[in-house]
């Protein structure tokens, strides 16, 4: 049972009889495009209260009372990247001094809410015996080396810019703003990455379950050193199934 925040599952027209989808219908903003443009240019927060994060929270609370959710063995959230877009706008609106962009204090609220809501979601799934799948988009992340210096200086417009002097490590991280990007994967037992290989001129999707030097992927499933699989949990978890059956037998 998926909470579809990206609103792409149903539009794909896939015939998935074993999958139920609950779509988040709320837009990122309740303001008109003209109002939002003016507010963004003037560095002002949203005029009307965004509804997306509040609706998502209500949907999560409703899961144990929702028939199709309780009949499913797995709950899914697709995706955390779009979810934080809703949360960010809610924070800006609720801040009495809010502007069009997050302040350092707002980033603290963003981190705290993502930490707490993720932990609550995981606990809720465990309490009801459900597996949990959370998807997130990726972005390139630059991490300063141990001897890299950070210099903050103002540009011609008076805005503070950060300049890094030294080596930078290129990583692929969850596409989440702020510090939670580096913490998100630590909340989950397994962390997989989807990628595409070109085979005979055709795209073939693969699922990587082991680190590749840039992504902090991992699995506790016995995979005998195999790093890439078809994007099918039945293939990845064969070793886990065999081990479990052996222990029970």
Question: How would you describe each model-predicted region?
Answer:
Residues 99-116, 173-176:
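A short acidic, glycine-rich active-site loop
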Residues 14, 88-89, 146-147:
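Short amphipathic alpha-helical segments
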Residues 113-129:
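Catalytic-core regions built around general acid/base machinery
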Residues 215-249:
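NTP-binding/hydrolysis catalytic cores, primarily Walker-type P-loop NTPases
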Residues 130-228:
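Phosphate-binding/switch region of NTP-binding enzymes
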Residues 77-107, 150-154:
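Conserved P-loop NTPase nucleotide-binding/switch module
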């Amino acid at each position: 049972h998926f909470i579809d925040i990206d609103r792409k599952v149903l539009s794909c027209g896939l015939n998935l009889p074993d999958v139920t989808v609950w779509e988040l219908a709320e837009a990122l903003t309740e303001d008109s495009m003209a109002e939002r443009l003016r507010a963004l240019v003037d560095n002002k927060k949203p005029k009307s209260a965004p509804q997306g994060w509040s609706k998502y929270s209500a949907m999560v609370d409703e899961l144990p009372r929702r028939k199709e959710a309780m009949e499913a063995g797995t709950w899914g959230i697709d995706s955390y990247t779009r979810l934080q877009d809703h949360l960010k706008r809610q924070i800006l609106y609720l801040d009495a001094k809010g502007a069009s962009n997050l302040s350092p204090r707002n980033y603290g609220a963003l981190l705290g809410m993502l930490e707490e809501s993720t932990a609550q979601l995981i606990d809720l799934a465990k309490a009801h015996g459900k597996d949990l799948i959370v998807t997130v988009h990726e972005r390139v992340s630059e991490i300063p080396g141990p001897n890299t210096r950070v210099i903050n200086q103002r540009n011609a417009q008076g805005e503070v810019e950060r300049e890094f002097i030294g080596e930078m490590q290129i990583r692929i991280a969850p596409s989440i703003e702020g510090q939670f990007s580096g913490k998100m994967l630590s909340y989950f037992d397994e962390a997989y990455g989807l990628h595409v290989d070109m085979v005979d001129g055709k795209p073939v999707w693969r699922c990587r379950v082991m680190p590749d030097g840039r992504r902090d992927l991992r699995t506790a499933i016995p995979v005998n050193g195999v790093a890439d699989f078809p994007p099918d949990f039945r293939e990845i978890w064969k070793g886990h199934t065999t081990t479990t059956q052996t222990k029970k037998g």
